[in-house]
Amino acid sequence: MENKVDIKKINEKIEKESAFIDLLRSEMNKVIVGQKNMVDKLLIGLLGKGHILLEGVPGLAKTLAINTLSKAISGSFSRIQFTPDLLPADVVGTQLYNVKQSKFSVKKGPVFANFVLADEINRAPAKVQSALLEAMQEKQVTIGEETFRLEEPFLVMATQNPIDQEGTYPLPEAQVDRFMLKTVITYPQMDDEKLIMRANLENTAVIVKPVVTLKKIMTAQKVVREVYMDEKIESYILDIIFATRYPEKYNLSDLKPLISFGASPRGSINLALAAKCYAFINRRGFVIPDDVRAVVFDVLQHRIGISYEAEAENMSSVDIITKIVNEIAVP
């Protein structure tokens, strides 16, 4: 009985604390049409203090969505266009020698912002990618002999283009694992595309106003962890994760030769957190199995290694996750 009272209290608190989500969504919907999945995943990354990798063909509003989110939240925003000639100093900053004062001064790079858009991250060499990914992990940057903390909230949203892979540097598996979510953006529906086409032909500038403060976001990042998760949901998450490592124990022996490595503990941590965030953005104080299923592909598709055999059979990590989710009993 006491547990039920607690859940009711949590639910009331979450409903109150998540009221800003509707404001944020309506502000983003002024500009972004028909990409609810992408907007939801950006909000999950923001609330979960995670970083997001967006993948999709050009022209699907990836950059626009990220830019709009930063405008709707009164925080600083910077964009880094990754190119083959980019240097780590172009991302994190460098030391400049002042001749008049005979000393070095620090010039901070674009990574010093609340929202950092890393556009076409797979176009820069590994050492540049590493500089950004280290900042993402450590939430700090070292320039010369000085270490600088990055401002909270700090969210990196990286984009990559799945086509036109010539001249690209694919992110190593260990680096990709640092992204909380990898979201694949699809084409809009025909009705949505009609609205997009009309809006662009009218050529009227839409002004996005800040509707949420940074302080409110930071409070929400703490409150989201209070969303209630039953032990049965925890077991459900762990069954999904362990099925990527030991499929034969879950009546999925046919998957064993297709998986070169399963999801790491980061997978279970991020799946649980993303499910809590999904419940939060839906104004609910407890996690249900549908929350887990709504985020499982975004959390795990970049955390499972597929074998040469899987590639030969034209199987992707998404196909493997689909089989696992269909097999694991829902609590």
Residue ranges: model-predicted function:
Residues 1-14, 247-331:
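C-terminal engagement/docking regions of AAA+ P-loop ATPases
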Residues 56, 119-120, 131:
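Walker B catalytic acidic pair
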Residues 10-18, 31, 168, 182-254, ...:
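Conserved C-terminal "switch" segment of AAA+ ATPases
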Residues 14-60, 242:
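Pre-Walker A (pre-P-loop) alpha-helix and adjacent loop at the N terminus of AAA/AAA+ ATPase modules
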Residues 98-103, 120, 124, 128, ...:
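Canonical AAA+ ATPase core
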Residues 57, 91, 159:
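P-loop (Walker A) phosphate-binding loop of NTP-binding proteins
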Residues 46-83:
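Walker A/P-loop
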Residues 41-44, 97-117, 146:
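Conserved alpha-helical scaffold flanking the Walker A/P-loop in AAA+ ATPase domains
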